[in-house]
Amino acid sequence: MDRPQYVNWIVREDGVVFEDQQPLNCYRLSYVRDDAILDDWALHIRKQYVPDGELEEDAALNKLTVEEYLRQYIIPQKGEPFGPTARSNDISEILFADLFEFILNYEVPRCKQHNRSGKNESEHGTDIIAYRFF
């Protein structure tokens, strides 16, 4: 998977400790408004749901535009039942997967958003798996 440009905005926050003075590894997004990076990020998120090679064909088979197909069948929508929850869960999982893969150099399989039982339903089970070969 290509490294999305927004990953350059992820920075480590030093000096964060838990109540027992145990240091925590924390990260934050330190961003500046850049429409090109935001567009790249949006495309990166969309690719978590449906690969480019399938998108146009699936839309055509359903007699929909790509945008209509994404809204009706793929991307959780904020105005639908459970849509906001699914969107929030998905973006969190994608952000953490990106952190593990592109910042911490782990291998992260990307398949959780593919072939879901419904666009507004998160699949239950393991959210993120990350591993590293030594």
Cite the ranges covered by each PLM segment.
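Mixed-charge (Asp/Glu-Lys/Arg
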Residues: 1-124, 129-134
